[in-house]
Regions:
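Histidine/acidic residue-rich metal-binding segments in metalloenzymes
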Residues: 1-57, 71-82
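Short beta-strand or tight-loop elements
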Residues: 60
């Protein structure tokens, strides 16, 4: 709703993350949000005022944490590498004993730049005053 209500348009410095919800749904959500704005902006005044595509807003201002069993490589391929952040629930059981190894399975064919985005750079882009 923040996208469709124009929150990210009005506050371009606002950053955030969707954590512990998985990310398998993100690529399709981006397509649907873009479609909604394109289709309904002809009849909805608020949507007609949105200048940047919803997918562009989310790439610049949000990130999502996939579950360890979700293929982050496929998510990157079907959307954008700047959308995803590493996370783990370790030491909880759902965090597994090897959270990095779980994601590395899906990132084995990707270069170091993509891995750095996932493991640290995307987080630092959104939260530049953080220390990791």
């Amino acid at each position: 709703m923040m996208v469709l209500d124009g929150v990210f348009e009005r506050h371009p410095k606002l950053k955030g993350a969707s954590v512990e919800l998985g990310a398998g749904w993100v690529p399709e959500m981006l397509k649907r949000l873009d479609y909604v704005v394109k289709t309904w902006s002809r009849v909805d005044k608020n949507l007609s005022e949105i200048k940047r595509k919803p997918s562009e807003q989310l790439i610049e201002q949000m990130a999502f944490t996939p579950f360890h069993h979700e293929d982050v490589g496929m998510l990157i391929d079907t959307s954008h590498p700047e959308l995803y952040l590493f996370s783990s629930d370790y030491p909880h059981v759902e965090g597994t004993t090897d959270p990095i190894g779980r994601f590395e399975r899906f990132l084995a064919d990707y270069d170091e730049n993509i891995k750095n985005l996932f493991y640290s750079e995307n987080f630092l882009r959104l939260f530049p005053n953080s220390r990791i």
